[in-house]
Amino acid sequence: MASAEIIAVGTELLLGQIVNSNAAFISQELAADGIYVYHHTVVGDNPERLKEVIKIAENRSDILIFTGGLGPTEDDITKQILADHLNKRLVEDEFHMNKITEYFTSRSRKMTENNKLQAVIIEDSVVLNNDYGFAAGMYLKANKHTYILLPGPPSEMKPMFTSYANPLLVSENGEKIILESKIMRFFGIGESQLAADLNDLILNQVNPTLATYAGDNEVVVRITATASTKEKAAALVKDMEEEILRRDGTFLYGYGEVSLPEHVTAMLLERKMTIAAAESFTAGLFQAEIARFPGISSIFKGGMVTYSEEVKQSMLQVPAEVIEEHGVVSSECAKVMAENVRRLCDTDIGISFTGVAGPDSLEGHPAGTIWIGLSVKGNESEAFQYVYGRDRNHNRRRAVKQGFQLIKHFLETNK
């Protein structure tokens, strides 16, 4: 099976001025073709270093895909360096030269000589038309390798790759190998624990492959299988998925690119269950998160941010004796907050967040101590305690996610 390497050319990438989104796009497209990308390389606009990168890539990859360095300026060196490396001439492509000339003529503007460089290609290349710019792309086979040269701007690179380069790659790589992937998302279990639970599967993986990633207060598992047909690849993925679920299915919250808040919001919308929130240390973060999703106005009636004790009493009607006897960082306060916001907003669900964001302690509780209250109409109110670390904003984000998880658990166990 052919292997590919993506070489992004541009000093601006090394300086972090531009994010290399091209590599992610090309990798996803090639994965669907059954072509493995084993290396992403970024090199600046330096001839000697680019020559070195080309030699290294040829020793480990069948297909070399270049992005960037095809423009009209002196630092656009990709095709010149590759042409020298392959002992090939640079020649003019008539189509792109006419396109550039017509552009300047139609606007009564003088065309500088350097603009012609965009229409120059390496001899023996298949020209890849640039439908959204001037720099010609190239598809070239030499020395038992395939070289693809694409422009740097994503608005030009993506359509060129999709319309011209990728079809050539697929047609020349024989029978298409089908790649099937599935993303599983877990919350409430750390990456190290999940990896330990799946250790034998990870160590013995062949096909499908299995990988775990730490996300934002969650763990992502990716299963990838290859086969001659989509059905066979999907079956391999399914077998692995079922084994993972058998071991840690209680922590699974969803699949693909759907986040935990989005998944829970969809459940609430489907059941037409209304919700309100009372927030202290999260300061409206839960409400801001749930408000991101379309259609939320039909179920999210509103909420309150009651940071101080005085506002908890005056707006949320938390009895002074609850605060005096138990403190604001307590099960009792969390439950009253959830109950009262549900009552005041007349909703099915009320959720509350109170705790110590950090880094300092409060009421004798260390940073990261939080309580989440949950009040559901017709059910006894509950409060759940968690103890995180000292990172203030991490604690706030994690608490909000935990709140969504608690709602999810209730909905799943009370269908």
Swiss-Prot record:
A Pfam match is: MoCF_biosynth
Q: Cite the InterPro entries for this sequence.
A: CinA, CinA-like_C, CinA_C, CinA_KH, Competence-induced_CinA, MoaB/Mog-like_dom_sf, MoaB/Mog_dom
User: What Gene3D superfamilies does this protein's entry cite?
Assistant: 3.30.70.2860, CinA-like, MoaB/Mog-like domain
Superkingdom to which the source organism belongs: Bacteria
Q: SMART domains from the entry? A: MoCF_biosynth (SM00852)
The family line of this record is: Belongs to the CinA family.
PANTHER family found in the cross-reference section? NICOTINAMIDE-NUCLEOTIDE AMIDOHYDROLASE PNCC, NMN AMIDOHYDROLASE-LIKE PROTEIN YFAY
What is the name listed in the Swiss-Prot or TrEMBL entry for this protein? Putative competence-damage inducible protein
Protein source organism:
Listeria welshimeri serovar 6b (strain ATCC 35897 / DSM 20650 / CCUG 15529 / CIP 8149 / NCTC 11857 / SLCC 5334 / V8)
